[in-house]
UniProtKB/Swiss-Prot annotation:
Chemotactic for B-lymphocytes but not for T-lymphocytes, monocytes and neutrophils. Does not induce calcium release in B-lymphocytes. Binds to BLR1/CXCR5. Highest levels in liver, followed by spleen, lymph node, appendix and stomach. Low levels in salivary gland, mammary gland and fetal spleen. Residues 1-22 form the signal peptide. The gene is CXCL13. GO terms for molecular function: CCR10 chemokine receptor binding; chemokine activity; CXCR chemokine receptor binding; CXCR3 chemokine receptor binding; CXCR5 chemokine receptor binding; fibroblast growth factor binding; heparin binding; receptor ligand activity. Keywords: Chemotaxis, Cytokine, Disulfide bond, Inflammatory response, Secreted, Signal. This is C-X-C motif chemokine 13.
Length: 109
């Protein structure tokens, strides 16, 4: 009797785990790669509206870089392209550097 109740409890526990995983997958809107084809052709900075970096995850085994151009076209860029690596390094340095905060000193009477 103890064995049957234990096995039933175990089966109930295992069957309840799959919906939890499904709830967590809601946060991943698409569980596949967004870029079908990647380009390594240089895009001048003046034509770029924004850049989105998608790290590798459950749905896609590779890192993806998506560039939105000002003419509303979207280009998937090869993350190994030298020009995009240099551009990302420049952007990282800009975002990590902080402007000095002005210090106002009060004169104590």
């Amino acid at each position: 009797m103890k064995f049957i109740s234990t096995s039933l409890l175990l089966m109930l526990l295992v069957s309840s785990l799959s919906p939890v995983q499904g709830v967590l997958e809601v946060y991943y809107t698409s569980l596949r790669c967004r870029c079908v084809q990647e380009s390594s052709v240089f895009i001048p900075r003046r034509f770029i509206d924004r850049i989105q970096i998608l790290p590798r995850g459950n749905g896609c085994p590779r890192k993806e870089i998506i560039v939105w151009k000002k003419n509303k076209s979207i280009v998937c860029v090869d993350p190994q392209a030298e020009w995009i690596q240099r551009m990302m390094e420049v952007l990282r340095k800009r975002s990590s550097s902080t402007l000095p905060v002005p210090v106002f000193k009060r004169k104590i009477p």
